[in-house]
């Protein structure tokens, strides 16, 4: 009987729950923007509007930093297949973004790029972990007991290391919990180190068209190589529509701009209008260089 608030995204979540309960034809959420974009305009000023997305794509984007929509808000609409529309409060006549079960095939494999900043990369390393069952279970059990949410997981096939990202603010608690859990292994050299790397971020490439697309990973990492960007850790699910990379946080703008240029074209306008107020020596020299 207690009254509680639902937190961030609570009003959207309420709307989609009601939409599902009432078997609505559609649910429309009004925002201060036109809809979901191919990238955060803070990094890519002329990012493109996304006309439509699948539920899975929208959930991935919202989880990995697209704050316009909370991932929880989509859940009630998936089973009844009710479409969700995101529209601008001030321009409701604009089409916005449609999120639904049936999405027309895009000519581009990637739908959008997104990033989560303020992360810390926690790693548990040691040759004594190889072939020992239960290490991953104990690792994430320790996180669960401290109510620490994990945003990305990457593990070496040799089982000699496992790393994952959490909020930077949870870093000290996570390290303390893990060192307590693996106290015996640390003392006996079975686990060599448990450490946390500060100031990292996750950049995610999302799109249903990525599934089965040959050479896409090479395209991503080739673009990073050209931009001299280093990848600290990588994660990709079996669904194949998300490639997530951990990088240094200060490199996020360059990483997003690089990938947006790679998959969506140049962000530089083809035409620039220039007005010269006067035609002195400086103006004459400038026109000769154009």
What are these regions, as identified by a protein language model?
Residues 1-270:
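C-terminal catalytic "cap/lid" subdomain
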Residues 272-290:
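Glycine-rich adenosine-cofactor-binding loop
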């Amino acid at each position: 009987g207690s009254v509680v608030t639902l937190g961030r995204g609570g009003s959207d979540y309420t709307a989609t729950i009601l939409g599902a309960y009432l078997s609505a034809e559609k649910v429309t959420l009004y925002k201060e923007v036109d809809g979901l974009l191919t990238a955060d305009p803070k990094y890519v000023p002329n990012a493109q509007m996304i006309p439509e997305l699948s539920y899975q794509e929208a959930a991935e984007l919202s989880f990995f930093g697209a704050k316009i929509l909370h991932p929880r808000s989509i859940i009630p609409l998936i089973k009844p297949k009710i479409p969700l529309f995101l529209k601008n409060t001030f321009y409701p006549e604009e089409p916005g973004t449609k999120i639904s079960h049936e999405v027309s095939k895009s000519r581009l494999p990637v739908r959008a790029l997104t990033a989560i900043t303020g992360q810390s990369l926690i790693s548990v390393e040691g040759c004594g972990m190889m072939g020992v069952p239960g290490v991953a279970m104990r690792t994430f059990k320790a996180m669960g007991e401290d109510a620490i949410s994990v945003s990305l997981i990457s593990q070496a096939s040799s089982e000699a290391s496992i790393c994952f990202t959490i909020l930077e603010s949870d870093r000290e608690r996570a390290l303390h919990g893990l060192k307590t859990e693996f106290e015996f292994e640390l003392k006996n050299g079975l686990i060599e180190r448990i450490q946390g790397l500060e100031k990292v971020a996750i950049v995610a490439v999302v799109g249903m068209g990525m599934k089965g697309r040959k050479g896409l990973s090479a395209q991503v990492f080739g673009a990073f190589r050209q931009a001299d960007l280093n990848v600290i850790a990588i994660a990709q699910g079996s669904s194949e529509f998300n490639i997530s990379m951990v990088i240094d946080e200060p490199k996020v703008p360059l990483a997003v701009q690089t990938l947006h240029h790679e998959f969506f074209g140049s962000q530089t306008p083809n035409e620039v209008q220039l007005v010269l107020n006067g035609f002195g020596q400086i103006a004459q020299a400038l026109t000769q260089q154009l």
